[in-house]
Amino acid sequence: MTVRLREKYYKEVVPALMEEFKFKSIMQVPRLVKIVVNVGVGEAVQNAKAIEAAVNDVAAITGQKPVVTRAKKSVASFKLRAGMPIGVMVTLRGDRMYDFLDRLCSLALPRIRDFRGVSRSSFDGRGNYSIGLKEQIVFPDIDYDKIDKIRGLEVAIVTSAPNDEQAYSLLKRLGMPFRD
């Protein structure tokens, strides 16, 4: 099974980036390293079933079983003790990463209400891009009738680009709908 976005990267994006940035070697061309999807589940302190629902949602969206993240410190004002489950996250690499990015750009983002494109200011200065989604139901993998609560999720796209300009060019050519 070949992933559509990976083929596009090697056939179209790599030659275009080599020409644009005048790279001498193909190994200098920025590439996707990993995508991290994180869901913070604050209500898990009172409701233990919320973590299970978040695990199922993230597994359906990404195709990979997420790991449960736990609190590092106790915070009395949040009624939180160290070691309590407070979120779920999954790190995608390889084919699953390209497949997820393809579905994010072509299916999920256009389904957001009043969507005009993602912001260019969400780069971190080192070539990585972060985006937050307010609801998980924009993914077609989630059945609206089976969710217990609308949760947001954060998506961090890590690239090998040394700066934001190269990362922007890479993501733009891969199909990320930026607001210009």
UniProtKB/Swiss-Prot annotation:
Gene Ontology CC: ribonucleoprotein complex; ribosome
Family: Belongs to the universal ribosomal protein uL5 family.
Native organism: Chloroflexus aggregans (strain MD-66 / DSM 9485)
Oligomeric and partner information: Part of the 50S ribosomal subunit; part of the 5S rRNA/L5/L18/L25 subcomplex. Contacts the 5S rRNA and the P site tRNA. Forms a bridge to the 30S subunit in the 70S ribosome.
Keywords carried by this UniProt record: Ribonucleoprotein, Ribosomal protein, RNA-binding, rRNA-binding, tRNA-binding
Function in brief: This is one of the proteins that bind and probably mediate the attachment of the 5S RNA into the large ribosomal subunit, where it forms part of the central protuberance. In the 70S ribosome it contacts protein S13 of the 30S subunit (bridge B1b), connecting the 2 subunits; this bridge is implicated in subunit movement. Contacts the P site tRNA; the 5S rRNA and some of its associated proteins might help stabilize positioning of ribosome-bound tRNAs.
Coiled coil location: none
GO biological process: translation
Domain of life of the native organism: Bacteria
Record-linked NCBIfam families: PRK00010.1
Gene assigned in the entry: rplE
GO molecular function, one term: rRNA binding
Keyword set includes rRNA-binding: yes
Protein's name in the database: Large ribosomal subunit protein uL5
